[in-house]
Amino acid sequence: MPELPDLTVYLERLEAIARDAPLQRLRIGNPFVLRSVAPPPSAFAGRRFLRAWRIGKRLVLEFEGEHYAVIHLMILGRLHWKKPGAAMPKGSGLAAFDFEHGTLLLVEHGSKRRAALHLVQGRGALAEFERGGLEVMQATLEQFGEALRRDNHTLKRALTDPTVLAAIGNAYSDEIL
């Protein structure tokens, strides 16, 4: 599952590649991935991509008019930058964000479909994705220690609980330990 370091790389690359570019269209390749439809995918066409950031393990792509695409890659979801108008891979292609100079593909390998795409409007709609975990890259050592001691958890459980620490999961908790 992509965690903090992986998500940071996605965000940095996406900002470098697509910032300020208008989205030509948003294609949905598999309807299960779309977990909300207000606004509909068609409402994103023509809107400039403004920036990307993270809420926990979710990537937030902000477009003009306070339109947001919130992506949770889960275990096997990945993002790929391809040539303009790239076809979605059969079976694994979930969604495509088409820009004039390239296409951002959301794919998920494996048979279980866990990745999610939420389309929301208005900054207030993003609150539902907040789990409350401490953003470790902005935290002081004292805040980090307090977060780990706040509840009666094993160290492994505290590291992987999104209400304690944001964007750290099983893979990187093992590295930390």
Model-derived regions, located:
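A cross-family signal for N-terminal binding/gating loops and helix N-caps
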Residues: 1-107, 111-115
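Phosphate/anion-contacting hairpin/loop surfaces
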Residues: 69-177
